[in-house]
Regions:
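Hydrophobic alpha-helical segments of integral membrane proteins
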Residues: 21, 25, 29-36, 77-92, ...
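Membrane-water interface at transmembrane helix exits
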Residues: 18, 22, 47-51, 69, ...
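Long, highly hydrophobic alpha-helical transmembrane signal-anchor segments
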Residues: 27-61
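Interfacial loop-to-transmembrane junctions
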Residues: 196-215
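Helix-loop-helix junctions within the multi-pass membrane cores of secondary transporters/permeases
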Residues: 95-171
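Alpha-helical transmembrane segments in multi-pass membrane proteins
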Residues: 6, 10-14, 18, 22, ...
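Glycine/small-residue-rich loop that forms an oxyanion/phosphate-binding "nest" at active or ligand-binding sites
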Residues: 57-98
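Interfacial loop-to-helix junctions that mark the boundaries of transmembrane helices
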Residues: 1-6, 30, 49-58, 122-128, ...
Length: 224
């Protein structure tokens, strides 16, 4: 859990720095930076999506995961949670829910979140999560300057999501082979790609609704 705790702390520190710098950065500059990050997110998504080999498993996982997530309204649930936090922290502004949802997806859905958490739970090595912490802390500064304090609240999402994967890793060790992790990385990277498209304003995909696909690909890998 140490790696995940450090990761959450880095996001909070990055958010604090972003809030301090926010007033001095023109809106057009933060908008340009956000689009730049969006393009980088797209690149990361495309790169990671090439990890998988079982295309059929990915397609079925994405379709079934999207159906399950939509039925459960996961994206809406995240937005409602963001709005609830927004009401509790009125100073966060009307964009708090957007910052919370966007940052949570960026920090949780990526390959490093899954693989790093698994590595932490299976081997006790936190190196990948430490690297992710540095990257997340830097991006939190920029994201906060554009989206506000909601970005900092995503640290809770990271703590819960990555912490759960780390704790469950020991129990799932027999089935989480390198090949299975590669398929999970592939699906997660597809979601990162979709998020990047949202960030540059090309699409409005409800990415959170597809998160179950990351875990559905595990049984599908062995069945197909």
């Amino acid at each position: 859990m140490l790696g995940t705790i450090v990761n959450a702390g880095a996001i909070i520190l990055g958010c604090a720095a972003g809030l301090l710098l926010r007033r001095g950065i023109p809106e057009r500059v933060t908008d340009a930076v956000m689009k730049g990050i969006g393009l980088c997110v797209i690149y990361i998504g495309v790169s990671g999506a090439l990890e998988g080999e079982k295309t059929i498993a990915m397609i079925i996982a994405m379709a079934a995961g999207g159906a399950i997530g939509t039925a459960l309204d996961l994206n809406g649930g995240m937005e409602r949670l963001g709005r609830l936090l927004e009401e509790k922290l009125a100073r966060g502004g009307s964009g708090l829910s957007t910052g919370f949802v966007t940052a949570s997806l960026i920090y949780c859905v990526g390959a490093m979140a899954v693989v790093g958490s698994l590595q932490s739970g299976l081997t006790g090595s936190h190196d990948m999560l430490y690297t992710k912490s540095l990257l997340d802390g830097i991006s939190a500064i920029v994201l906060t300057a554009s989206l506000g304090i909601g970005v900092g609240l995503s640290a809770a999402s990271v703590l819960i999501y990555q912490g759960a994967i780390t704790l469950l890793a020991g129990l799932l060790a027999p089935v989480l082979t390198d090949a299975v992790v590669a398929e999970m990385t592939c699906v997660g990277s597809m979601l990162i790609f979709a998020l990047g498209l949202n960030m540059i304003g090309v699409t409005k995909i409800k990415v959170m609704d597809f998160v179950p696909a990351i875990f559905l690909v595990i049984p599908l890998y062995y069945v197909l």
